[in-house]
Amino acid sequence: MAKEVSKVVKLQVRGGAANPSPPVGPALGAAGVNIMEFCKQFNGRTQDKQGKVLPVAITVYKDKSFDFVIKTPPAAVQLMEAAKTKKGSGEPNRKKVASVSWDQVKAIAEDKMQDLNAFTVESAMKMVAGTARSMGITVKGDAPF
């Protein structure tokens, strides 16, 4: 018989850097999870992604056991890395802060494909391009589709 789910906690934590301080500690403490056990497991599974922001969904069961799924870094973070900028624009419709190529958008879309609800790479590229547009990052060139 399957375990009964008590709570699902969603966080964004840097790879290999989970520790009991906020935001991880309070969120997991309120759910009744052994915080140090989560930190050890998370840091062990994300050693190869040191420093990258990773969304994680932690499923907490009634018996206080847990499991978690690590997703790919957010598209916004990947776009900022590709554009070599620290943050998006405060006024994306007026002030553009950087630009990326369609090849970079395609690489990000292929990386994010498992987490997006898109069936084709082209539709995933459109989602990533929309994220870029809302951040004040322009996509250079004509769309390849």
Swiss-Prot record:
The keyword Hydrolase does not apply. One of its GO terms (molecular function) is structural constituent of ribosome. It comes from the Bacteria. InterPro entries: Ribosomal_uL11 (IPR000911), Ribosomal_uL11_bac-typ (IPR006519), Ribosomal_uL11_C (IPR020783), Ribosomal_uL11_C_sf (IPR036769), Ribosomal_uL11_CS (IPR020785), Ribosomal_uL11_N (IPR020784), Ribosomal_uL11_N_sf (IPR036796). Keywords: Methylation, Ribonucleoprotein, Ribosomal protein, RNA-binding, rRNA-binding. Signal peptide: none annotated. One of its GO terms (biological process) is translation. One or more lysine residues are methylated. PANTHER family: 60S RIBOSOMAL PROTEIN L12, LARGE RIBOSOMAL SUBUNIT PROTEIN UL11M. Belongs to the universal ribosomal protein uL11 family. Part of the ribosomal stalk of the 50S ribosomal subunit. Interacts with L10 and the large rRNA to form the base of the stalk. L10 forms an elongated spine to which L12 dimers bind in a sequential fashion forming a multimeric L10(L12)X complex. This is Large ribosomal subunit protein uL11. It comes from Christiangramia forsetii (strain DSM 17595 / CGMCC 1.15422 / KT0803).
